[in-house]
Amino acid sequence: MNINDMNDAPEVSSSESQKNEIVSKQKLLEAGTYFGHKASLWNPKMKPFIHSKKMGTHIIDIAQTRKALEYAYKLIEKYAQKGASFIFVGTKKQAKDVVKAQALRTNSIYVSERWLGGTLTNSRTIMNQVRTLSDLEKLEESGYEGYTKKEGVEFSKKLAKLQRNLTGIRNMKHLPQVMIVADVNTDKIAIKEAQRKNIKIIGILDTNSDPSLVNFGIPANDDSVKSLNLIITILADAIVAAKNGKQLFAYQGDEAIVFPATSENVGKDGEERKPRKPYVKRRPDGDFQPRHNNNESETK
């Protein structure tokens, strides 16, 4: 079956049939994986993955999203079976929680806050900072004994900063073999370091992304919390499956996929969509009244 045939494939309805596919089209649609960016912001290299343009916005071909997701799953599972280690990277607001959660679930290292330059290319500097982190934690346990209150406050601030930036990588003993990136535009520095160290890169590609930055890309919305949660969790499922663990989303059917509750409503260009205020027109006397729909007859 080629990609065009997949576009016209019938919807799967039975629970058992859904478990034969990595994820249903319905869940891809529900997660908003198909929303791209404004057409004016696109990267021409993403043209093969764009289905259409609607109201000035590119629509991603979810048939290709699902096909790429399945391939990436098998690729990651194969690496994991061979004992590869992974690093999850996602420093944008929408990706932080799922990146951290799935990295911890798979016993992988992760960066969900600021990427520290040299994380992969200057291990000596990073290890020195990790040692400083450990020393400050010991000082905190002692109540900063022997130091003034002012010095204790300064130590606490430095400790909080180091914990925020280093917690996900403090146990890194060697370089990972595979990097999973939530947004290739936001975390270009991480990608460049991975390229220098010949680390395989698997990333989500929105319509404004450069697919040449990764070894394998998954065309999908990288701004939606639901989209990121769905894709990152499925990729993590591949690592878990290689170790005979329980999968959460991949090949589990629609009923198993529950998206996180969030008040954030992220638009296709990374901006929160704010509800439109109802239109009102001003009366001559200065009061306001709602505008009636012209198609509705007024009740007399």
UniProtKB/Swiss-Prot annotation:
Transmembrane segments: none annotated. One of its GO terms (biological process) is translation. Residues 261-300 are annotated as: Disordered. GO terms for molecular function: structural constituent of ribosome. One of its GO terms (cellular component) is cytosolic small ribosomal subunit. Signal peptide: none annotated. InterPro entries: Ribosomal_uS2 (IPR001865), Ribosomal_uS2_bac/mit/plastid (IPR005706), Ribosomal_uS2_flav_dom_sf (IPR023591). Keywords: Ribonucleoprotein, Ribosomal protein. Residues 282-300 have a biased composition (Basic and acidic residues). NCBIfam families: rpsB_bact. Belongs to the universal ribosomal protein uS2 family. This is Small ribosomal subunit protein uS2. The gene is rpsB.
